[in-house]
Amino acid sequence: MRSQDLHQRLADLGAKPLHCGRIVRAWLQGRALDACTARQRAEDFLPLGVRHGLPQVAAELEGIARLHSEHPASDGSSRLLVELADRQMVESVLLPRGGLCVSTQVGCAVGCVFCMTGRSGLLRQVGSLEMVAQVVLARRRRAVKKVVFMGMGEPAHNLDNVLEAIDLLGTDGGIGHKNLVFSTVGDPRVFERLPRQRVKPALALSLHSTRAELRRQLLPKAPPLSPEELVEAGEAYARRVDYPIQYQWTLLEGINDSLEEMDGILRLLKGRFAVMNLIPYNSMDGDAYRRPSGERIVELVRYLHSRGVLTKVRNSAGQDIDGGCGQLRARATQGTAERRIPARQA
């Protein structure tokens, strides 16, 4: 089901645009579809046919996604394993201070070598209302004021559905445009389409290395943009929407944590409208990668920050409960057969 399908479903019951707006807003806030306002009861506002049909609509919306399990962590985050209607699983993460990270695909075709999600390949796309349903489930647990499309999947490979979800959350969902974050490895279509949207989200770009060859090794199926081209495209978008690009850098000991790489970051980002997020690697079973020591991470942050690049450390939420992206899903689906599909282009 997509957004237009929901509106058509309500229209078939006799709902006018004003009625649809209230019903959709109630759902997006995690409330009952016939939730009244302080000044008006549902029976005084919604047509009889709509009121009679709402229980069935509510059941259909509940069937889009359900909470399979919740895993609170010591850092205040909570990982949600969400089961979709076809029994596929995706993850979303409730973050401290009102944030939520949602998944846009079941699996991923990019195949980043340090990501658990990429190991399964792409299984299927997540629909726009399946993304929104992750927000609804989260809002029933705590307030959500920021949504980052940074969970399982590459949003650029499911662009139509992601942009539709962003539009819905940025309008009827009541989330500020700067608090909607589109994360991508850097697909040219993103830079073409995002500036034309009614809701223009913040942008996070996966950099991970300033050396083109190493970046290709780390992100083997990412579009062939050089680090320089990626930063130029990001800067143009940042200046257009007037908020900075977040550059993502997963810190891998002995691979991309050298001073040579840090000098490359300074070369690319100094003077840019940008924030560098250093993300210490979250170890997975059976892999050869490690995060640098805490002392080394502090050293790198100080090196960049003191030379003019705003730098933050972003630890993966819920590290004590298999917090790496895709790890909960991998554990839940262990032993089940899965079929990979090629990425559907937007």
From Swiss-Prot:
UniProtKB keywords: 4Fe-4S, Cytoplasm, Disulfide bond, Iron, Iron-sulfur, Metal-binding, Methyltransferase, S-adenosyl-L-methionine, Transferase
Domain Radical SAM core, chain residue ranges per copy: 94-320
Taxonomic source organism: Pseudomonas aeruginosa (strain ATCC 15692 / DSM 22644 / CIP 104116 / JCM 14847 / LMG 12228 / 1C / PRS 101 / PAO1)
Paired cysteines (S-S): C101-C325
GO cellular component: cytoplasm
Major place of residence: cytoplasm
Active-site positions on this chain: E91, C325
Xref: InterPro entries: Aldolase_TIM (IPR013785), Methyltransferase_A (IPR040072), rRNA_lsu_MTrfase_RlmN/Cfr (IPR004383), rSAM (IPR007197)
UniProt-recorded name of the protein: Probable RNA methyltransferase PA1839
Record: residues binding [4Fe-4S] cluster: C108, C112, C115
